[in-house]
Amino acid sequence: MSVLTVALDAMGGDFGPSETVPAAAQALSLLPKLNILLVGDQNQLVPLLQQHALSSHPRLHLVHASQSVSMAERPVIALRNKTDSSMRVMLELVSSGRAQACVSGGNTGALMVMAMRVLTMLPHLKRPALCSSLPNLHGRHTVMLDLGCNVNCTPEMLWQFACLGDLFAKHVHAVSSPKIALLNVGEEVIKGSKLVQETAKLLASDKQFNYIGFLEGDQLISGQADVIVCDGFTGNIALKTAEGIARFFYSQIKASNEADKVKNKSNTAAEIQTSLSVMHPDHYNGASLLGLNGIVIKSHGRADRRALSNAILHAVAEIEQQLPRRISERFIAEHTYER
């Protein structure tokens, strides 16, 4: 059994070590082949490791970092001044080969610029894209990107994102010929901005894609497409709206279930709550920063230990599929990026 090593930014996210340490414990208990490098301030981490009986765990190793990056910090300032931050040290562990992937719930902008500096982009790729897998109505997954890295995009960038999403769907979700769609304000071919229209022409003319046209926002989880491509501004708003609605319904049904228990009523609400749990954002936490010379997983900033543990497991899946190597091979082998 080969050992897989993930570096975890212990100081990242809204809750920091109080959730990252127990998340590491959960992930280690689920995967016997997993090693975790826990990166952060040892003065804060050592007491928590003792509290969770992890001080002498053979598969967890503490890597000290004296600084951390706040959620409000400007990315360029963090890049310049936080060279010993838990985020930066985590990325350097991947760059040096000590870790095969890394996970952070920290500042997204800082993570992107640091990752581009430390790991660099794969050949021929312009920018990284943030990619997530959403559960859909067919019981499968729909890959969506970009989810916030790139607010201003060109058609060539969206074409590259389609390539990344296509590879992700094939190798992570085992979809042989992923159906690719562009997120738009309507399904009709005449609808959409100049960016969307020009990107549609690129995708439709490229025979390597199974391009199916436009999808609207209410079709994100319909299962009509395996990959949905959009700019980071649109994608971030669409995803967070969907997650907010999912959390609302889940919390309402959970409250109804608790009320039923008090009143000794039937278990209908509990059954619905169980069915909907797969739609809860915590269940699919962990967005991939694709296009880099290394595996970088961005967790929700407000993720709890269960959600963070899922992000770590997501990193392991990408290690096993050797995703950066597959992406690099695709872009080196095909020169269609030169448009």
UniProtKB/Swiss-Prot annotation:
One of its GO terms (molecular function) is phosphate:acyl-[acyl carrier protein] acyltransferase activity. Keywords: Cytoplasm, Lipid biosynthesis, Lipid metabolism, Phospholipid biosynthesis, Phospholipid metabolism, Transferase. SUPFAM superfamilies: Isocitrate/Isopropylmalate dehydrogenase-like (SSF53659). Pathway: Lipid metabolism; phospholipid metabolism. HAMAP family: PlsX (MF_00019). Belongs to the PlsX family. This is Phosphate acyltransferase.
